[in-house]
Amino acid sequence: MSLCGARANAKMMAAYNGGTSAAAAGHHHHHHHHLPHLPPPHLHHHHHPQHHLHPGSAAAVHPVQQHTSSAAAAAAAAAAAAAMLNPGQQQPYFPSPAPGQAPGPAAAAPAQVQAAAAATVKAHHHQHSHHPQQQLDIEPDRPIGYGAFGVVWSVTDPRDGKRVALKKMPNVFQNLVSCKRVFRELKMLCFFKHDNVLSALDILQPPHIDYFEEIYVVTELMQSDLHKIIVSPQPLSSDHVKVFLYQILRGLKYLHSAGILHRDIKPGNLLVNSNCVLKICDFGLARVEELDESRHMTQEVVTQYYRAPEILMGSRHYSNAIDIWSVGCIFAELLGRRILFQAQSPIQQLDLITDLLGTPSLEAMRTACEGAKAHILRGPHKQPSLPVLYTLSSQATHEAVHLLCRMLVFDPSKRISAKDALAHPYLDEGRLRYHTCMCKCCFSTSTGRVYTSDFEPITNPKFDDTFEKNLSSVRQVKEIIHQFILEQQKGNRVPLCINPQSAAFKSFISSTVAQPSEMPPSPLVWE
């Protein structure tokens, strides 16, 4: 680390130990590469990622209909037509108007699309008497991802021209179980307030309840994810690894403080933007922790490679330690650029884990089902081979391997917590870099950097899921969700709805959910 970085480090540590202090602020040069570049720790990043303008690519925002009311005049009166990126364009950046600029002149939209969009705006007036002012259409642009329980597209918000992500939650009201799961995810997305956890910026206006089948959630648009970065050919510096791991654990500490288990932490669910800010996403499998150990929990969780041994061994009760196991697997994958435990089946998955950690004690297997214990005890007794972790890469230093070994502990009660992992010295440089040039919680002044009083905040009160206890029918949940969405509407913003006449929308509507191969595999039935 440079002298400047070391100086910032000393000041940051002073802030970490209790006062606010400052570090020199400078200018950040933008790099256009697949792998986001980290700003040096002593420089301040002045720009929000949404404000990166990519040369040679214009954002097309089409005004559709001018409203004359003063409320409408205050809002941007435009319906967004797709700002299509050239298929050959490689950069993962999305254009948007610079701060304070109106969207530039757009290519003319086909007349029928304009007419259809205008008709849609009108059509929504009588349906939503609670928002008499107006509504704006949002038009899908291109698919950017398929989660376990939804499809994600990039869109342009017609109110400010910003690029955002639109997630379609399909088949919401098929049965009571899917209703509850979607409502839980929706409530979580609206509850989260943390820079390393994806949250809802907005929810599109629902139609009349009789036509209410899908839910559309607007979130920040992220350019990549950790899976794409890991499999890319670009080298990952130890600084990248530290700042990514720091943010994963920072987000996880917040989730766990809310009493939430994510239950599907994997590289593809860790979104990364163009300046390396990371956000945990996809809460389709998340739930509140179960404190009553006699209550059974579902085992259909976590993609196999990242699945903790207690789940593989059929434990009917598990804790947030399952997420830490997944983070350990990802940490090793960041270091070695390959999946740590890449097995063909759940039984082989368990065998690969015991090859590394050695045969677990009976105490460590106390929550396992009898069939799983028998499988372990039938096999040969294995010695641990943890020193092999040093061969992952030259970045697998003593500090790195020490932290990794605290995460990859067979017994979940002895596995390190997110809070304690964040206090590990390996992450000091990641914390420094994040808070001196990447975060939104600290800021730079003419005299230097002013640090937040709490580098890794938690939430209080916890996320409350008691609302689920009283949900008894699909129609009842549908009405409650419909009302919940209407209540979420921020009063100061024009409500958004989709233009159902557009070709892009029809493609979006018909886009399918993840194929079965992408779903977490079914649990192993131990004999």
Curated annotation (Swiss-Prot):
Family: Belongs to the protein kinase superfamily. CMGC Ser/Thr protein kinase family. MAP kinase subfamily.
Residue spans of biased composition, Basic residues class: 26-54, 122-131
Subunit structure: Homodimer. Homodimerization is required for intermolecular autophosphorylation, kinase activation and nuclear localization. May interact with components of cullin-RING-based SCF (SKP1-CUL1-F-box protein) E3 ubiquitin-protein ligase complexes. Interacts with LEF1, MEF2A, MYBL1 and MYBL2. Interacts with the upstream activating kinases HIPK2 and MAP3K7/TAK1. Interaction with MAP3K7/TAK1 seems to be indirect, and may be mediated by other proteins such as STAT3, TAB1 and TAB2.
Catalytic reaction list: L-seryl-[protein] + ATP = O-phospho-L-seryl-[protein] + ADP + H(+); L-threonyl-[protein] + ATP = O-phospho-L-threonyl-[protein] + ADP + H(+)
Gene Ontology CC: cytoplasm; nucleus
Name used for this protein in its record: Serine/threonine-protein kinase NLK
Cofactor(s) required for function per UniProt: Mg(2+)
Gene Ontology BP, a term: negative regulation of TORC1 signaling
Compartments where located: Nucleus; Cytoplasm
Domain comment quoted from the record: Contains a TQE activation loop motif in which autophosphorylation of the threonine residue (Thr-298) is sufficient for kinase activation. This mode of activation contrasts with that of classical MAP kinases, which contain a TXY activation loop motif in which phosphorylation of both the threonine and tyrosine residues is required for kinase activation.
Record GO terms (molecular function): ATP binding; DNA-binding transcription factor binding; magnesium ion binding; MAP kinase activity; protein serine kinase activity; protein serine/threonine kinase activity; SH2 domain binding; ubiquitin protein ligase binding
Organism: Canis lupus familiaris (Dog)
UniProt KW keywords: ATP-binding, Cytoplasm, Kinase, Magnesium, Metal-binding, Nucleotide-binding, Nucleus, Phosphoprotein, Serine/threonine-protein kinase, Transcription, Transcription regulation, Transferase, Wnt signaling pathway
Functional description taken from the UniProt entry: Serine/threonine-protein kinase that regulates a number of transcription factors with key roles in cell fate determination. Positive effector of the non-canonical Wnt signaling pathway, acting downstream of WNT5A, MAP3K7/TAK1 and HIPK2. Negative regulator of the canonical Wnt/beta-catenin signaling pathway. Binds to and phosphorylates TCF7L2/TCF4 and LEF1, promoting the dissociation of the TCF7L2/LEF1/beta-catenin complex from DNA, as well as the ubiquitination and subsequent proteolysis of LEF1.
Enzyme class per UniProt: transferase
Activity regulation, free text: Activated by the non-canonical Wnt signaling pathway, in which WNT5A leads to activation of MAP3K7/TAK1 and HIPK2, which subsequently phosphorylates and activates this protein. Activated by dimerization and subsequent intermolecular autophosphorylation on Thr-298. Other cytokines such as IL6 may also activate this regulatory circuit.
SMART domains membership: S_TKc
Modification sites for Phosphoserine: S522
Residues of the active site: D264
Post-translational modification: Phosphorylated on Thr-298. Intermolecular autophosphorylation on Thr-298 activates the enzyme.
